[in-house]
Amino acid sequence: MILKGRDREAVLIRNANLACAVGKLLLGEMSSWQEFLEPDTIDYAKLPRKQLKSRKYDVQTNLQNRIDRFCDLNFHKMTRTKLISLYEELKAHRTLEIPYLEFCEKYSPITGFYEKGFPEYSTVCISLWGLQYRFPEHDFSNDMVIAINQVNKAEEELESYQKRNHKQLLKNQTEIADIVRKTESAKRQVMQLAFSLLECYLNGLAWSYCQKENISTLSNRKINTLKDTFNVSLRDKIQKYPTIIFGKKIKENSCNFVLDKAKQFRDSLMHPSPFSAPEKFGGYDKLEKLFNLDIETISKTISDIIDIIEEIEAMKGKNSPVPIWLPKIKETAKKLFQRVTKDRTL
């Protein structure tokens, strides 16, 4: 259908306004969905002729150029037409969550995405908060930051009671018990989250490799090792994924503590039981591990897991961006490491 005159001008103005609305939403500049939807509620064809001409002039001399600059600055292949399609999808659902690769195929790759350290299995999340990304390491690392801070805070609170004799402590038994419960809970969270972070990082490596490389050249055993992330053990992921993907091995002393010591605590938390672990897994007392998870073990676990991740990251080469979540977890963990070092010197 060929539009003429007023109708063609109305469509031109409407489309430009819809594209602008999407741009503002992606930048987090929309105050409400009502504001976002407003450009689509106007019957532009019924505007007075003078107003229609004025808006058309503004679109052609200003608005379209602003839209094009926005696309060029933030996307590789975004167009006005694609922005309008994105508007229609957002109008239907209000928010949008879509895998990054699907977003690239449907709309456009996003400028600076890989350079900033986001993994390609990220989910693109568009809402009134703007354009954001979500992926497992992001969630687990943020959870770890919170839990580590809770450990530090509770330990600081306990320090104020250290120089008191037991008779004095009995007077504050309720307060002390509450602090101890907080620190014990936070330590359990840190241990579980540290392993979850490591495993989702390793699974992400395998997924990315399978997406980019021609894995048909690999043996069936190696393909299954990469793809069957549910049944492949953590030990095999740490030791085999770097070899398959980068042709390099993790140093044995890098993962000994995590696999042979820390994992016993983690397994006792994930599978608590009065039964001891099977002999092939060390035959250790699960309850003993469950009840005696101390700050030194937590600190060593975090330190070694960070070292494993950084060793693998180094295999990617100097030009590979640092995972966007890694600096924050390192900075937070440093405070815990300092606390452990301080306690040892007392």
What positions do the PLM features span?
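Charged, amphipathic alpha-helical oligomerization/scaffolding segments
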Residues: L197, F257-Q264, S268, T297-K300, ...
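Polyanionic, low-complexity intrinsically disordered segments
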Residues: M1-D68, F275-L346
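Short, hydrophobic, well-ordered secondary-structure elements
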Residues: K182-Y209
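Histidine-centered, metal-coordinating catalytic motifs and their short helical/loop contexts
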Residues: E252-Y284
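Charged alpha-helical initiation segments
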Residues: M1-L25, R80-K187
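A solvent-exposed, charged loop/short amphipathic helix patch at secondary-structure junctions
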Residues: H166-T174, L218-I223, F281-N292
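N-terminal accessory interaction module
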Residues: K46-E102
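Short non-catalytic regulatory patches outside canonical folded cores
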Residues: L202-D260, P272
